[in-house]
């Protein structure tokens, strides 16, 4: 019986995407056609985030605008801050992130708008706030 149980996500298809692919013959993972290892070697984190969101690597001007927008979206709401402060001291960081992202989604002004433009804005806000929430949780937990 235990031989039939698959470990982890082996053989499990969660969904299909045009963003990333596993290329077994190259032993590589790709994002938008670029090997992840090459992106790690040659790009900043923000450049890769831009690539994932927009489908192409940014120009210097696009990257500057992207970074400025990300920085302007870092502020956490009082609700999220209070919830982080109330979390158990032994909370796992992934549980904190999951809870904070759920709260961000509930508070987001574009929650019900699923247009491509609104979805990119929602991702940008989550992208900006998540590391701040995690850092704050490490201080309080």
Model-identified regions with their sequence ranges:
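Hydrophobic alpha-helical bundle cores within soluble ligand-binding/oligomerization subdomains
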Residues: 1-139
């Amino acid at each position: 019986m235990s031989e039939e149980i698959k470990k982890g996500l082996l053989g499990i298809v969660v969904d299909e995407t045009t963003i990333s692919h596993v290329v077994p013959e190259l032993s590589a993972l790709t994002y938008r056609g670029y090997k992840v290892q090459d992106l790690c070697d040659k790009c900043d984190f923000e450049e890769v985030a831009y690539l994932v969101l927009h489908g192409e690597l940014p120009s210097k001007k696009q990257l500057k605008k992207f970074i400025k927008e990300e920085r302007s979206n870092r502020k956490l709401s009082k609700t999220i801050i209070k919830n982080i402060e109330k979390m158990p001291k032994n909370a796992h960081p992934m549980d904190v992130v999951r809870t904070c992202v759920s709260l961000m989604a509930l508070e987001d002004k574009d929650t019900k708008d699923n247009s491509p433009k609104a979805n990119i804005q929602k991702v940008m806000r989550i992208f900006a706030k998540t590391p701040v929430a995690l850092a704050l949780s490490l201080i309080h937990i």
